[in-house]
Amino acid sequence: MRTLRIGIVGLGGIAQKAWLPVLTNTAGWTLQGAWSPSRDKALRICESWRIPYVDSLANLASSCDAVFVHSSTASHYAVVSELLNAGVHVCVDKPLAENLRDAERLVALAAQKKLTLMVGFNRRFAPLYRELKTRLGTAASLRMDKHRTDSVGPHDLRFTLLDDYLHVVDTALWLAGGEARLASGTLLTSESGEMCYAEHHFSADKLQITTSMHRRAGSQRESVQAVTDGGLYDVTDMREWREERGQGILIKPIPSWQTTLEQRGFVGCARHFIDCVQNQTVPETAGEQAILAQRVVEALWRDAISE
């Protein structure tokens, strides 16, 4: 099997913190280079990571089999379209595109070109969340909270819903097994239209699902709580596992070998995409799964602005 040639588009904060440490550890692939429209900044970053800088998106596409896209959401449609039309497989940060219509077009284009298009929902690959998912066969309720210390603004409601709350909705619905029906919800905004608090209630058969986010909670905390027939589960910040059963409380320590990026699912996400490209299999977050949560979140936003 030929070694997969990987490229990177976009070298912002998330790319530097979460993706470059994974992708520069070339286990089974080669990192051909990176491109960013901010040339001077990109050159400095590429030099520090010892990555070749490529002077255009077209040249990057011509030298790669697959590309990870970490550019701004506003650029996703144009960048991903160009890569797919050049015959390149793509893994892109969420959301797939700035609006649902463009996201659907990209899904259709990837299908037409018979290429892999995956959205990098890293939480689906967090080991503790994946383990929790196997324990939810008899779950009665599932609650996911993702709060911020003090992050009201500067962006508007729609931006924050798609940039951050989307993680909560996607992870909760994935843990619950897929689609769910919205029962009720609340969206509170500041006087200038910035998101302050969101809480929504969904149902999937007998399972009740709650998603919640406060933008000024005084704590940067993420947790998932599940009530099942015979056990209570609580996963905090993707690294603390607490399980309560009749015989007592089990708290699992973090494996000493597991890095933070592995705990948060970035390593698993990147490897899953690369494995799918190499083996010509369908990623877990491709097709409708790539845009399921975006459909829900955009509907929440439309409902909020129509009130």
UniProtKB/Swiss-Prot annotation:
The keyword Oxidoreductase applies. One of its GO terms (molecular function) is oxidoreductase activity. InterPro entries: Gfo/Idh/MocA-like_OxRdtase_N, Gfo/Idh/MocA_oxidoreduct, NAD(P)-bd_dom_sf, YceM-like_C. Its EC number is 1.-.-.-. It holds the Pfam family YceM-like_C. Keywords: Oxidoreductase. Belongs to the Gfo/Idh/MocA family. This is Putative oxidoreductase YceM. The gene is yceM.
